[in-house]
Structure formats: structure tokens, C-alpha cells
From Swiss-Prot:
Subcellular location field: Cytoplasmic vesicle, Secretory vesicle lumen; Secreted; Nucleus, Nucleolus
Family the UniProt entry places it in: Belongs to the pancreatic ribonuclease family.
This enzyme's EC code(s): 3.1.27.-
Sequence positions that bind Zn(2+): 40, 82, 113
Protein name according to UniProt: Angiogenin-2
Biological role: Binds tightly to placental ribonuclease inhibitor and has very low ribonuclease activity. Has potent angiogenic activity. Angiogenin induces vascularization of normal and malignant tissues. Abolishes protein synthesis by specifically hydrolyzing cellular tRNAs.
Motif Nucleolar localization signal mapped to chain: 30-34
Length: 123
């Protein structure tokens, strides 16, 4: 595995979360070293990492604009949003759960970036 993919997993992958509430976000953001300073928004993708990797090819992905890839199937995700105030710890987050498609950038068949600001169209 390459460093960019390992970084992607550290920032955005949690296979089986212990919860999806604000406490989950506060704990995970600190555990994954995203609280110095407080990162504004971060999304954790849950499930199987092979399914996420499959977005990089045609098994579970399709081309999207600007060289990105969009998943064909939805993923369970938890998005953590900083509540505002000081960017210095302690950081307080609000959790938002969703089941949605994801948009990522891939390199050599591995996810390296999650497009945080992608909002899926309403069905």
C-alpha cells in the first residue's frame, strides 16, 4: 500500500463504528489526529475497504468530473462538522449520518482523496 492510500484510510475509513453520535466524532477526530487545529469537516466511510477501492475501477465506480470517481452503490458514512468557535482543542463536533454515494480521487487503483463537498442529488 502506498502512503497516500494509508493517509486516506487514516482520515476517512472506520469499518465498524461504535456509534454515529457527536461523541463518536469527538473521539475519532482526536484519535485520527485531526484536532490540531480542529478540522472543519471530515467524513468517515464505514464498511469494507475493498468496496471503497472498487470505486477506483468499474466494479463499483464510474468516471465523474475532473478526473474523480463516483461510487455506483451508496456507503454508510458519518460526517463530523466542527461546531465553530476556536480552532484550538478541545474540538467539538456534530455528527451527521447518511447512506450515500461517495466521490473520490484515485491513483494507481487506490483511493487517495475524498471529495468532502460532494452533495448527492436528491432522488
Amino acid at each position: 500500500q502506498n502512503d497516500a492510500y494509508r493517509g486516506f484510510l487514516r482520515k476517512h475509513y472506520d469499518p465498524s463504528p461504535t456509534g454515529h453520535d457527536d461523541r463518536y466524532c469527538n473521539t475519532m477526530m482526536e484519535r485520527r489526529n485531526m484536532t490540531r487545529p480542529c478540522k472543519d469537516t471530515n467524513t468517515f466511510i464505514h464498511g469494507n475497504s475493498d468496496d471503497i477501492r472498487a470505486v477506483c475501477d468499474d466494479r463499483n465506480g464510474e468516471p465523474y468530473r475532473n478526473g474523480l470517481r463516483r461510487s455506483r452503490s451508496p456507503f454508510q458514512v458519518t460526517t463530523c462538522r466542527h461546531r465553530g468557535g476556536s480552532p484550538r482543542p478541545p474540538c467539538r463536533y456534530r455528527a451527521f449520518r447518511a447512506n450515500r454515494v461517495i466521490v473520490i480521487r484515485c491513483r494507481d487503483g487506490f483511493p487517495i482523496h475524498l471529495e468532502e463537498n460532494f452533495i448527492p442529488p436528491r432522488p
